[in-house]
Curated annotation (Swiss-Prot):
Binds 1 Fe cation per subunit. Keywords: Autoinducer synthesis, Iron, Lyase, Metal-binding, Quorum sensing. Fe cation binds at H54, H58, C121. It catalyses: S-(5-deoxy-D-ribos-5-yl)-L-homocysteine = (S)-4,5-dihydroxypentane-2,3-dione + L-homocysteine. Disulfide bonds: none annotated. Belongs to the LuxS family. Homodimer. It is an enzyme of class 4 (lyase). This is S-ribosylhomocysteine lyase. Its EC number is 4.4.1.21. It comes from Clostridium perfringens (strain ATCC 13124 / DSM 756 / JCM 1290 / NCIMB 6125 / NCTC 8237 / Type A). GO terms for molecular function: iron ion binding; S-ribosylhomocysteine lyase activity. InterPro entries: LuxS_sf, Metalloenz_LuxS/M16, S-ribosylhomocysteinase.
Length: 151
């Protein structure tokens, strides 16, 4: 199997929450695409709830784009410990952290979930505003770092 960047990360030595630049790709026409690991909870110790994570995905899709112009996608990690963000350009981790703090703060102010209906969402019943707010609050209280390895 081809080496996968995320499998090369020593998950026993990271300290969540953090933002990590997971890689940069340069396309055949010179386009730069950056990938970020937005880790909310500690790998192999905690999980984001299915409903809370799905709801956060909906919120982050909008709020992160309010601060970052070149977002391609924000996707939940299969391990349920955070999200991947892909973006055009070589963006600084500090800018991602600032946008994420803004976005999670905005989640705490919300009273309804965007696009949580069968027309716009493939799993419209798999949402919880309460759990999304709880996850957002926990990440903000713990503080988001750009230092991801435990020393």
């Amino acid at each position: 199997m081809v080496k996968v960047e995320s499998f090369e990360l020593d998950h026993t030595k990271v300290k969540a929450p953090y933002v990590r630049k997971a890689g940069i790709k340069i396309g055949p026409k010179g386009d730069i695409v950056s990938k970020f690991d937005l880790r909310f909870v500690q790998p192999n110790k905690e999980l984001l709830s299915d409903k809370g994570m799905h709801t956060l995905e909906h919120f982050l899709a909008g709020f992160m784009r309010e601060k970052l112009d070149d977002v391609i996608d924000i996707s939940p990690m299969g391990c349920k410990t955070g999200f991947y963000l892909t973006s055009f350009g070589d963006i600084n981790v500090k800018d991602i952290i600032e946008a994420l703090e803004y976005s999670l703060s905005k989640v705490l102010e919300q009273e309804e979930i965007p696009a949580a209906n069968e027309l716009q969402c493939g799993s419209a019943k798999l949402h919880s505003l309460e759990l999304a707010k709880s996850h957002a609050k926990q990440v903000l209280e713990n503080g988001i770092s750009d230092k991801f390895y435990v020393e």
